[in-house]
Amino acid sequence: MSETAESGSSKEMADHEAERVFLAVVDDSDEMPIALHFACRRAEHTDGRVALFYVPAKADFQHWMAVGDLMREEAREAGEELLQRQSAEVQRKTGKVPILFIREGDRSEELIKLMDEEPNISILVLAAGTEDSGPGPIISYLLGKGARRLHVPITIVPGSMTVDEIDAIT
């Protein structure tokens, strides 16, 4: 099941056809703010716009349907709060309200579906994880099984970069 937030409708995207749209994935990772800052700086310098994408964590509790539904609703509410905080940050940095997308399902699959559905998304901006376990699940998926389905360039920002380093290159 997938869903596009009202503020991320195809109509709104069509209204901004001339704008370059930088899509950033919102999550609670340490490196996410780095990717978001990079997307904001690029949007600011190219008269573009930032779009934020969020998929709540799946509720694994299947024993009682009502409990699973409650867990999904709580995860969605937490995600909406996170999106609102990041949206305010994007607006502060770029002067433009970002486009918001909330989906349910597998995050990597929903990300590819979104990029297929929204032709105005110009670039996907991700930050690589800083842990020894690798760059992160989305990057690993997109560079592996998902690579053949991509039609949007990806910018991978090292998660260890600082805001000052990003500012210097953007």
Summary of predicted features, one role per range:
Residues 145-159:
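Short, acidic/small-residue loops that bind anionic groups at enzyme active sites
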Residues 51-53, 99-103, 155-157:
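General small-molecule cofactor/ligand-binding pocket signal
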